[in-house]
Swiss-Prot record:
Source organism of this protein record: Lemna minor (Common duckweed)
Compositionally skewed regions (Basic residues) per UniProt: 1-17
Gene Ontology BP terms: mitochondrial translation
Protein name per UniProt: Large ribosomal subunit protein uL16c
Origin superkingdom: Eukaryota
InterPro entries hit by this protein: Ribosomal_uL16 (IPR047873), Ribosomal_uL16_bact-type (IPR000114), Ribosomal_uL16_CS (IPR020798), Ribosomal_uL16_dom (IPR016180), Ribosomal_uL16_sf (IPR036920)
Length: 135
């Protein structure tokens, strides 16, 4: 699963997801892509599940690019712990996704293979997505 090798700070604020994505919203590498339509946090596990779904369907044909990286730590407190005594420890990593962000790209396969592969990956995502074609 994806996670940063090292970060300057162990814990982060949750932040807000407002507006649309103005970076990472164009196809850069492949010919077909999966684009987010809603704002959400996407966990490293979900990113990996989507990547596996695409690569299993596409087999050896084509190349896959994962266009998002989980760089935000999410902290959780242990179960049945009283309030206070500081912030919980980092449990997993998420990527902050805004509408318009490209999640995955694929190239070197036919359109119907790419469309089906992206549909499988989209079912692993917690948000609505759309399939887009370069050009």
């Amino acid at each position: 699963m994806l996670s940063p090798k090292r970060t300057r700070f162990r814990k982060q604020h949750r932040g807000r997801m407002k507006g649309t994505s103005y970076r990472g919203n164009h196809i850069s590498f492949g010919r077909y892509a999966l684009q987010a339509l809603e704002p959400s946090w996407i966990t490293a596990r979900q990113i990996e599940a989507g990547r596996r779904a695409i690569s299993r369907y596409a087999r050896r044909g084509g190349k896959i690019w994962v266009r998002l990286f989980p760089d935000k730590p999410v902290t959780l407190r242990p179960a049945e712990t009283r309030m206070g005594s500081g912030k919980g420890s980092p449990e997993y990593w998420v990527s902050v996704v805004k509408p318009g962000r490209i999640l995955y790209e694929i190239g070197g396969v036919s359109e119907n293979v790419a469309r089906t592969a992206m549909l499988l990956a989209a079912s692993k995502m917690p948000i609505r997505t759309q399939f887009i074609i370069e050009g």
